[in-house]
C-alpha cells in the first residue's frame, strides 16, 4: 500500500515547529507565504533544519508573479538550487514556463541537473500551464518526483476531476506523484480519500495571530494596502494533527479492507 504524505508549507521556524508537533511528514519551506511563497533565505533553512527533524523541500521562486523568467532570474534560481543542495535540503520545489504556457524544458533540465540527488517537486506553475496532461508526461520524462497541483483550479476540490485523471496516469512506472494542494483542510483530505486514490497532501494550516506590538501606527502599509501589518500568519499544529489523523484513519481502513 502506498505511503501517505502530509506536507506542510511554512515560512518561519515557529511554523515549522508547529507543523512537526502536529505530525507533518515533510516541510515545504518558503518566505512570504501570504503572497504564494518566494525563495527563503539560507539562514531560515539552517534554523529550521536545526530545530526540526523533518525532510525539507525548499520552494525556489525569485519573485511574486508568473513563471516566465528572465535570464537573470533563471541564474538566481540555478544558484539557489546549488546553495540548498550544499546546505542539505531533501529537495527543491521549482517550475519554469515559456511564454506559451508550456514547461520550459531547457531551464528545467538545467535546474534538475543542478539538483543532483535531491528530490524535485514541480510546483503550481503546473496549474497555469496550457496543457496539463502533456506537462505531466514531460515531467515524468524529466524524472520529477512530485507535482503539487490544485487541478488547475482555485482550490483542489474544484480541480478533483483533473486530479483523478492525473492520479490514474501516476500508476504508470516512473510517473510523478500527485500532491493535492490549495484549500486543503482535514475535511477536504477526507473527501479526497473517499473519492480518489491520491495519497499526498499539501497544506499550510494557517491561523492568524495578533501582533505583540503595543504601539501601532495604522494606515502605513509596507506592501499591498490590503495587508494588515499587525496580523501574523502561523501554522496551527492542531489543524495539522487533525489532517494527519484523517490520513491515518483512512490508511487503517484501507488495510482492513485488503
Question: What feature does the model see in each segment?
Answer:
Residues 21-27, 52-55, 88-91, 114-118, ...:
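Glycine-enriched alpha-helix->loop->beta-strand junction motifs that scaffold or abut catalytic
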Residues 63-69, 212:
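A short acidic, helix-capping loop that chelates divalent metal ions and anchors anionic groups
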Residues 26-38, 83-99, 144-157, 196-217:
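Glycine-rich phosphate-binding active-site loops on the catalytic face of alpha/beta enzymes
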Residues 37-64, 103-125, 160-185, 225-253:
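Alpha-helix-loop-beta-strand connector modules within alpha/beta enzyme cores
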Residues 11-21, 68-80, 127-142, 166, ...:
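Catalytic cores of alpha/beta
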Amino acid at each position: 500500500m502506498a505511503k501517505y504524505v502530509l506536507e506542510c508549507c511554512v515560512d518561519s521556524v515557529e511554523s515549522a515547529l508547529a507543523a512537526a508537533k502536529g505530525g507533518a511528514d515533510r516541510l515545504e519551506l518558503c518566505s512570504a507565504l501570504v503572497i504564494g511563497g518566494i525563495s527563503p533565505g539560507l539562514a531560515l533553512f539552517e534554523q529550521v533544519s536545526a530545530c526540526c527533524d523533518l525532510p525539507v523541500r525548499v520552494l525556489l521562486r525569485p519573485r511574486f508573479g508568473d513563471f516566465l523568467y528572465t535570464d537573470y532570474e533563471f541564474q538566481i534560481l540555478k544558484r539557489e538550487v546549488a546553495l540548498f543542495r550544499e546546505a542539505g535540503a531533501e529537495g527543491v520545489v521549482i517550475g519554469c514556463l515559456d511564454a506559451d504556457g508550456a514547461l520550459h524544458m531547457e531551464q528545467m533540465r538545467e535546474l534538475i541537473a543542478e539538483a543532483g540527488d535531491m528530490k524535485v517537486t514541480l510546483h503550481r506553475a503546473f496549474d497555469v500551464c496550457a496543457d496539463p496532461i502533456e506537462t505531466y508526461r514531460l515531467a515524468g520524462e524529466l524524472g520529477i518526483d512530485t507535482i503539487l497541483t490544485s487541478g488547475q483550479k482555485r482550490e483542489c476540490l474544484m480541480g478533483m476531476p483533473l486530479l483523478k485523471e492525473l492520479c490514474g496516469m501516476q500508476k504508470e512506472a516512473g510517473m510523478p506523484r500527485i500532491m493535492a494542494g490549495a484549500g486543503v483542510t482535514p475535511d477536504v483530505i477526507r473527501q479526497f480519500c473517499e473519492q480518489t486514490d491520491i495519497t499526498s497532501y499539501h497544506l499550510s494550516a494557517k491561523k492568524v495571530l495578533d501582533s505583540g506590538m503595543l504601539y501601532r501606527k495604522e494606515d502605513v502599509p509596507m506592501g499591498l494596502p490590503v495587508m494588515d501589518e499587525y496580523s501574523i500568519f502561523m501554522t496551527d499544529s492542531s489543524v495539522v494533527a487533525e489532517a494527519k489523523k484523517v490520513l491515518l484513519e483512512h490508511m487503517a481502513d484501507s488495510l482492513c479492507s485488503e
